[in-house]
Amino acid sequence: MKRMSASRFALLLLMVIVASTGSVSALAQDSAGSFRERLRARMAQKGGSDAAGEIVNPAGKITQPGNYRFTLEHDGIERTYLVHVPAKYQPGHPAPLLVAMHGGGGSMEYQASDDNYGQISKSDREGFIVVFPNGISPLKSGLLATWNAGTCCGPARDRNIDDVGFIRKMIDKLSQQVDIDRQKIFATGMSNGGLMAIRLACDLSDVFKAVASVAGTDNTTHCNPTRPVSVLFIHARNDDHVPFEGGRGKTRRQEAVTSFTSVPESVSRWVKRNGCGPEPKRVLDKPGAYCDR
């Protein structure tokens, strides 16, 4: 990999789940299709988050660990997000920030559920703040929400919702209430949320140090990052919703999705953008999964 400078160093990783014969992660244990079905089943059983005892729209600085719910207006639309401030947080000591985005048809509550992703528990162990924004939803409950990640997905794309502007505004507002290390802001997401994480790497490269996309490829319509951003793609070979080799996956509403960019093409784009060397290095190789850097 080509090194530019310590401040401009960027990393590109591709983790591929090649089969369901072994595991190095939860995703490796099932095919992508069955994994999504399990997520839908859980969503049907429970829609709440683990953010018990939320404080809604607190004014001023946040000084105590806990769970917080916020609303803000952007482009004339009321947007919502959940914030978890970890037990290790100390005012005056800037903490890293993770923006975690739900998949298409999901919600911030579902993404925040520790039963589903464990991000709140991880936040408490590692000491980073995690924020769960909600996409655009046709329902007051915020369920069935989508992100405008470029060519996907659903109502957010069709209405050309400014999700990039919302995320920037959310981070700016949050940084006024908690002490965030602006050099350690990261994004991750599942499926449509993963696609959105990649768009943030393109459009908010001045904000994000690194992004990780699970089951989401690069479906941006334009991408001109002002600096390298480390990118991680985690994808199943047999994903039948966002196919590894690109194209349309299985869905009940074809018009809600797109012809997805393949994983190899997505990786190739970021190799060029980040000035990485053309030959990948295998850094993980286990039954069922491998990772190239």
Placement of each model-derived feature along the sequence:
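Bacterial N-terminal signal peptides
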Residues: 10-21
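Bacterial N-terminal signal peptides that target proteins for export
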Residues: 2-12
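Conserved alpha/beta-hydrolase "acid-adjacent" motif
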Residues: 241-245, 259-262
